[in-house]
């Protein structure tokens, strides 16, 4: 009888682990990851551009991921993303230059200049309004 109870508890723990993994943003992102060099090229191109700045260990970044994915998919947007937690992307001078001191942050660039930003966790409707407001995609 004890074996059945232990087996049952192990199965419950496994099911909970799988649920947590699936519900915490394991879905494939609809944004395109870039590095610091590509970020600079995107800004310098002077074309209208949305760039999402995040960290993989940031809880609000994990929370916003499904919301952002939903809007990108629905609106058929092209969004670049920079994970500043990756060693190659962490540069304090760069972060200071672009005033990137909070994640998640979605930036809108036009003519090589930042025109708007959305910082912190936001709902899908708030994200959609941000993209619509900066609509020349």
UniProtKB/Swiss-Prot annotation:
Disulfide bonds join 58-61. Coiled coil: none annotated. It comes from the Bacteria. The lineage of its organism: Bacteria, Bacillati, Bacillota, Bacilli, Bacillales. Keywords: Disulfide bond, Oxidoreductase, Redox-active center, Secreted, Signal. Its main location: secreted. It comes from Bacillus subtilis (strain 168). Belongs to the thioredoxin family. Residues 26-136 form the Thioredoxin domain. GO terms for biological process: cell redox homeostasis. The gene is bdbA. The keyword ATP-binding does not apply. SUPFAM superfamilies: Thioredoxin-like. GO terms for molecular function: protein-disulfide reductase activity. This is SPbeta prophage-derived disulfide bond formation protein A.
């Amino acid at each position: 009888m004890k074996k059945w109870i232990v087996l049952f508890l192990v199965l419950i723990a496994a099911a909970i682990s799988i649920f947590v993994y699936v519900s915490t943003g394991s879905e494939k992102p609809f944004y395109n990851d870039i590095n610091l060099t590509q970020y600079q090229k995107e800004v310098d191109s002077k074309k209208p551009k949305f760039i999402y700045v995040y960290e993989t260990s940031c809880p609000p970044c994990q929370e916003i991921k499904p919301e952002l994915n939903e809007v990108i998919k629905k609106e058929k947007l092209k969004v670049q993303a920079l994970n500043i937690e990756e060693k190659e992307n962490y540069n304090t001078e760069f972060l200071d230059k672009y005033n990137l001191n909070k994640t998640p942050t979605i930036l809108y660039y036009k003519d090589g200049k930042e025109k708007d930003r959305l910082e912190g966790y936001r709902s899908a409707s708030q994200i959609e309004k941000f993209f619509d407001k900066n609509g020349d995609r």
